[in-house]
């Protein structure tokens, strides 16, 4: 069984604990009942305990449940996966189409190694087939680049040239909180702010690399970015209040007239 469930923000009763920890516990129990021989879990590259981020900590707790399950397993600690509908190319593209200024995280550049979704799927298949000997491995893309360079590359493919403004990490965390409160899908979630502040290129704690023949080889190039570009930009429909108002109007329209 492949276990990829996860959230990057909490919504109502969909908390990090319920989705990451309780959800993983349920997968393990179901695997035992049905005689599943292998669990492949997709985790996060820097999931770890005691780091101050509920996302990272609950992902780590889920990893530990799998490790202690007694079932043969492979834990894939993956970095930033991109493709249509992602939270990287999608959100950056819509942001640079909407605003003339783009905020970059911190005054010291962090790095990222983006993984195209098709290569992430290939790694999942290899893990299911037992071709990855280590029980825990790091999964990162072939190309390492600074986050600012990745953003500029996306903006270039999207045909935009915004002004880039470095802002302190605390400001990105504040932006994340505000957009979680106000947007249906936030521009950046608090968990993602932590990821951007740290960079997404090195595993923490250490995990070995994939076998050479399974490692991603595709660069973060124009063709792959273009394939992941979304339509449109951010608008009023992305706001929670607009969604609420539309729901109220539908409700009123459905009521019988007197």
What are these regions (language model features)?
Residues 1-26, 30-33, 45-49:
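NAD(P)H-binding glycine-rich loop region in Rossmannoid oxidoreductase-like domains
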Residues 10, 45-57, 81-86:
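Conserved catalytic-site region of short-chain dehydrogenase/reductase
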Residues 17-21, 40, 59:
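Short alpha-helix in the Rossmann-fold core of NAD(P)-dependent oxidoreductases
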Residues 23-26, 38, 61-62, 116-119:
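Conserved cofactor-binding/catalytic machinery of classical short-chain dehydrogenase/reductase
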Residues 26, 87-88, 107-129, 135-138:
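Substrate-positioning beta->alpha
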Residues 64-85, 91, 98:
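Conserved beta-loop-beta element that borders a ligand/cofactor-binding pocket
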Residues 127-189, 202-258:
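Mid/C-terminal beta-alpha module of Rossmann-like enzyme folds, strongest
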